[in-house]
């Protein structure tokens, strides 16, 4: 879903309203690369200091740092594979621009990316290549959804789509069909978002502009909650679970909003803030 949304936003901001290619690459390198390096180093320090509380402890050293950059899925913050994988997708903007100019080229690209998703080799951890090949289909579908205003069409019949997508999603679990599960899950999530927007339009207002910062920071907050629970400072699992979710959302939002207000360029770059 995150990859799909990224593709949607990429088309909206970098294809529909294009900027020069090299400038776009430089912008994405800053927005993805600097937080990637910073949060990798932070994770290495924390996981070394609290090694006894970590499922996957780390160590500090130049060789370890280089390995974590080249093999992000094996690093102390394995979730950062996403930044490397999506970086590959941004680099391919000329291909996306060309293929989206014609329906036959678009259909052929979808077919090719579907084949890559289903049959690409797994286990290539170097620069998250396997992950990039596996998820690029959803990135492209996100761009298609933006180009053809598919979400707007969903809004007309979101209740029907909600029922159909939900039924297909449940069926796909029993059928063990991962691609069908992913596609129906995306449709289900979009329908639920449209439902929420219809009845509770301000539900996501508090953090809608900070989803990237939630992604970057939330894991550290959740690790802290887990450490507190492990040392009996949070005594009930249910309490810890709720605190983990809420803190994982709103602590990053608080940090990002404060940084945005201070408007210190270095901090903004480290947190991936656009300004």
Give, region by region, the residue ranges found by the protein language model.
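Alpha-helical transmembrane segments and their immediate juxtamembrane cytosolic regions
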Residues: 1-275
């Amino acid at each position: 879903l995150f990859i799909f949304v990224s593709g949607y936003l990429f088309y909206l901001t970098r294809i529909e309203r294009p900027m020069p290619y090299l400038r776009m690459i430089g912008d994405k390198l800053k927005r993805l690369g600097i937080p990637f390096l910073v949060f990798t180093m932070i994770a290495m320090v924390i996981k070394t200091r609290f090694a006894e509380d970590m499922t996957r402890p780390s160590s500090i050293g130049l060789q370890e740092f280089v390995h974590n950059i080249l093999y992000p899925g094996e690093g102390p913050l394995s979730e950062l594979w996403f930044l490397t994988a999506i970086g590959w997708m941004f680099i391919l903007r000329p291909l996306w621009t060309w293929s989206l100019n014609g329906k036959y080229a678009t259909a052929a690209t979808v077919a090719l990316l579907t084949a890559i998703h289903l049959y690409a080799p797994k286990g290539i951890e170097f620069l998250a290549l396997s992950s990039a090949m596996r998820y690029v289909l959803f990135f492209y579908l996100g761009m298609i959804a933006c180009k053809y205003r598919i979400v707007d069409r969903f809004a007309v019949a979101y209740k029907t789509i909600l029922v159909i997508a939900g039924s297909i999603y449940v069926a796909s679990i029993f059928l063990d069909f991962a691609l069908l599960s992913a596609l129906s899950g995306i449709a289900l999530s979009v329908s639920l978002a449209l439902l929420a927007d219809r009845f509770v339009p301000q539900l996501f207002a508090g953090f809608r502009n900070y989803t990237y910062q939630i992604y970057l920071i939330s894991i550290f907050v959740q690790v802290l909650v887990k450490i507190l629970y492990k040392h009996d400072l949070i005594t009930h699992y249910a309490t810890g679970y709720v605190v983990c979710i809420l803190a994982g959302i709103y602590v990053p939002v608080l940090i990002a909003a404060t940084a945005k207000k201070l408007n210190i360029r270095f901090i903004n770059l480290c947190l991936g803030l656009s300004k």
